[in-house]
């Protein structure tokens, strides 16, 4: 191996974990309404990644505020609204969904963020799909 490659590898291993890997990441979600005929497939962005955190061994001697860990959370969010296709006239067809513009590592604010990852949640359609691209149904 060359010295340059070896130095690059060592540099990456040493400093790679210190950089924030909390970034907006592409995510596909499926939205259904019981009253509407179709399922809507939407591509958006969510905050995902890793944040540096420390887990202290002396938890009994620290205040509770020192025990909370940083999570990858939203810095800036915009909401987009789309029309759900195939809804009857008495149903409001508008759906708003979040789009992560920027992310940060910080404390999880449970007032507006779900801080728990539920692995049993499904993300699929049970009805025929209508993809949604750049604000226009296809």
Curated annotation (Swiss-Prot):
Pfam families: Cys_knot
S-S bridge residues: 22-72, 36-87, 39-125, 47-103, 51-105, 108-115
PROSITE patterns, alphabetized: GLYCO_HORMONE_BETA_1, GLYCO_HORMONE_BETA_2
Residue ranges listed under propeptide: 133-138
Cellular component, GO annotation: cytoplasm; extracellular space
N-terminal signal peptide: 1-20
Gene3D superfamilies registered for this protein in UniProt: Cystine-knot cytokines
Record's keyword annotation contains Repeat: no
Protein purpose: Indispensable for the control of thyroid structure and metabolism.
Residues annotated as glycosylated: 43
Protein name: Thyrotropin subunit beta
UniProt GO MF annotations: hormone activity
Quaternary structure annotation from Swiss-Prot or TrEMBL: Heterodimer of a common alpha chain and a unique beta chain which confers biological specificity to thyrotropin, lutropin, follitropin and gonadotropin.
Family affiliation: Belongs to the glycoprotein hormones subunit beta family.
Record GO biological process: G protein-coupled receptor signaling pathway
Higher taxonomy: Eukaryota, Metazoa, Chordata, Craniata, Vertebrata
Keywords linked to the UniProt accession: Disulfide bond, Glycoprotein, Hormone, Secreted, Signal
């Amino acid at each position: 191996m060359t010295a340059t490659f070896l130095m690059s590898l060592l540099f990456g291993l040493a400093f790679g974990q210190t950089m924030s890997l909390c970034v907006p990441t592409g995510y596909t979600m499926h939205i259904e309404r019981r009253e509407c005929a179709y399922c809507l497939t939407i591509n958006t962005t969510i905050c995902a990644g890793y944040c540096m955190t420390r887990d202290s061994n002396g938890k009994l001697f620290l205040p509770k505020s020192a025990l909370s860990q940083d999570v990858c959370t939203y810095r800036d969010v915009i909401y987009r609204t789309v029309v759900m296709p195939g809804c009857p006239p008495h149903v409001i067809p508008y759906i708003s969904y979040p789009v992560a513009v920027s992310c940060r590592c910080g404390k999880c604010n449970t007032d507006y963020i779900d801080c728990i990852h539920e692995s049993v949640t499904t993300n699929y359609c049970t009805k025929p799909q209508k993809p949604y691209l750049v604000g226009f149904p296809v």
